[in-house]
Each structure stands twice: as structure tokens, then as C-alpha cells.
Amino acid sequence: YFQQLRNKVRIPITTGNAFTVAMVLAGVRKACDLMGKNLKKSKVVIIGGTGDIGSACARSLAFEAKDIVLTGRTRTTLEMAQGLLASLKGAKIHITTENNDAVREADIIVAAASAAQPVVDTNMIKPGTIVCDVGYPKNISHTSKHRSDIFVFSGGLSTVPTPFDMGFDLGLPNPNIIYGCFAESIILCMEERYENFSEGKGKLTPEKVEWIAQAGKKHGFELAPFYWGNELIDEERISTLLSKAVVY
């Protein structure tokens, strides 16, 4: 769709996924710090691991995690992604088409699938797991709130340097937060980079993600506080998580 749209308009366009990925990675790293997890010793499961956001997260985390498990609908596509990631000589790369089997032993889950309904049974997730759900609609059911022993948060959200009002409800918890994809367009304009920056699956390199993260920080766009739905995950909630979770 990106290529079709680009051919129909005379202005640069971007999916916004590079900055979304940057905020996902920042969220995972911060959650690891809060939960006392060592990312270098962790198994990371990426639901929707062959998609644009999922594959970009995998490329960056391949240099930070111990094991990465990619899930997807098509085994052939998964095998291609596995081969590309394995060539980076980083984390061990595994693949599966079964989401619930994959999450059983996960230390960290990045849920980035395109799905109309939740794709993971939260009862399969072990205590102490960090879950970053960047899917819209959400990959993880909001009924997961009954699991006070797992750290589930909405991924890909950014702060804004000034309250953001589009005149209608964006479904965000407060006006000081914006979707990462929206933020990317604003950041690129502020940097005067009028180009097709994020342009489709497989083209989001770790270098591009890092550049937009630093440009965003320069202009006041950084990782948003942790939320799940409209509920802020505050220090008290994190203390409860730590008391109930098995931390590795």
C-alpha cells in the first residue's frame, strides 16, 4: 500500500513506524530496568515478527537479547526472516506459527501483530514477564488486568512537548501523549527532512530507528509513562508486580 500511495501523491509520506519502534525499544529497556531483568539473558518473543514493526524490533534486539522467537502466520516468511536475522550473528533466532506456545517461556513479549482481536491467551504467560503491546487493536486482552504478576503496557507511545489536540478523541490516556507514528511526521518536519522516511516492510534499519529516536529527544518527544488502557502503571503497581513476579 505504501508504494501505491506514494505514486498517487506529490508530497513525502512515512508510515511512522521507525519512531514507533524506537519507543517500543525504549519501553522494553526501561521495563527491564524496573523489573530487574537482564535483557542479554532474556528470551524475547515477537508476536507478528515478520511485520514492519515486529521485524524492525527483531533487528535491533538481535544485538541485545539472548534468544528471539518470531511468530507469524506463514512458515515460509518466518524462515526467510530467521535467515536474515541469523546472519547478524547475534541472538539465537527461533520461529513458530503458534503464539500461545511461544509465550510460555518468554521473559519479554513484543506484541506487534495485525489482528482484529487478541491473539495471546494471557494465562499462558509466566509470572514476571514484560509484555509490550504495540498492536492496534490490542493483541493482548484488557482482561489481562487480573494478572497482577505480569508487566503489560501499551507500546509505541511518546510524550509531546506541548499538549496535542486534534479535535477528536485519539483513545490516548492524556493530551501529553501521542502515537509514535504521529510523532514521527512532526519530528521529520522539525528536522526539515522532507522525505519518505519509513517506507515499508524490511527497510527500518537499527540506524534509522536510532536517528529518529535522537531527533525526537532533541525536540521533546520521548518515551511516554507506562499505561495499560487508561490506567497509569505507577510505582505502587510496579512494587506489586515485583512482589508477585518471578524475576530472572
Model features per residue range: what roles?
Residues 1-40, 166-175, 179, 183, ...:
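Glycine/serine-rich phosphate-binding loop and adjoining beta1-alpha1 elements at the start
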Residues 30-108:
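Glycine-rich phosphate/diphosphate-binding loop of Rossmann-like nucleotide-binding domains
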Residues 90-165:
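Rossmann-like adenosine-cofactor binding region
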Residues 1-7, 80-87, 143-145:
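Short, aromatic/basic amphipathic alpha-helical patches
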Residues 19, 23, 56, 73-76, ...:
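Conserved active-site and cofactor/substrate-binding residues in soluble primary-metabolism enzymes
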Residues 7, 11, 17-29, 42-43, ...:
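N-terminal Rossmann-like NAD(P) cofactor-binding subdomain of oxidoreductases
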Residues 142-248:
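Adenosine-phosphate binding glycine-rich loop
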